[in-house]
Amino acid sequence: MFSGSIVALVTPMRNDSVDVHHLRELVEFHIAKGTHALVAAGTTGEAGTLSHSEKLLVIKTVIEQAKERVPVIAGTAMNATKDCIELTQQAMEYGAHAAFIMTPAYIKPTQEGLYLHYSHIAQSVAIPIILYNVPGRTACDMLPETVARLAKISNIIGIKEATGQMTRLQQILRLCEGSIDVYSGDDLTAAQWLLSGAKGVISVTANVAAKLMAKMCDLAMDDDQAGCLRIQEQLMPLHELLFVESNPIPVKWAMKKMGLIGGELRLPMTELSEKHHQALEKVLKNLELI
């Protein structure tokens, strides 16, 4: 249903509020560069610091600006199942093509708790759902066996797996037998995942190198292994630098240098440390992004 380069959009801020103007411009930027789909209000979009109404504003703005030209996947993760259902229903009413739901953070549910969380949500909304497993940020790891159980639910159609472990991809593909699409959630290993059965990548790097990420995915889907890996090698220094501090700190700094956004973050996120500025600027210049 969704494939290729799916950007995990940043949320532009101005004076500690959502910068709707620049958010709309980002949608146009990605459509022009060939990005295949947009994720609004996910981790890279600072969803953890957005209020309920701000999340809805971001989702609604992206949907309205995209005008059905590319799919919009709404980040609707909430720790409480009932709150997640409510937000997902609202995103569906706005016209989101799918919901993107991270595992609950901090509370560390059991595998059975994760199954019940997602199955209750899926039964309550008539919209495709993409699971999101990112244990490095949530302290909660959804195991392949749980993914396989959830894959039997008709509107749970995909998972963003951010461990970057090739064995994890292989386990999910084997256990689910094609009943769920897998998306790379780790830019550093995305090419290898794409060439090993992943349907696409939900990417931080695509915020700045949108055209190259889309091309890399296109080459992978065309089984051009050499071409895909060549672009991945070209992008590797950028991938690495975009994670020298917590996401989205480096990517927002890079986008500010590119003139795409103002670069403001919401506390407790702070601006990129000065010691990383020169290296990131050099990589952006090498890729002809600035």
From Swiss-Prot:
Catalyzes the condensation of (S)-aspartate-beta-semialdehyde [(S)-ASA] and pyruvate to 4-hydroxy-tetrahydrodipicolinate (HTPA). It catalyses: L-aspartate 4-semialdehyde + pyruvate = (2S,4S)-4-hydroxy-2,3,4,5-tetrahydrodipicolinate + H2O + H(+). Its main location: cytoplasm. This is 4-hydroxy-tetrahydrodipicolinate synthase. One of its GO terms (cellular component) is cytosol. Homotetramer; dimer of dimers. Its EC number is 4.3.3.7. The record marks 43, 106 as: Part of a proton relay during catalysis.
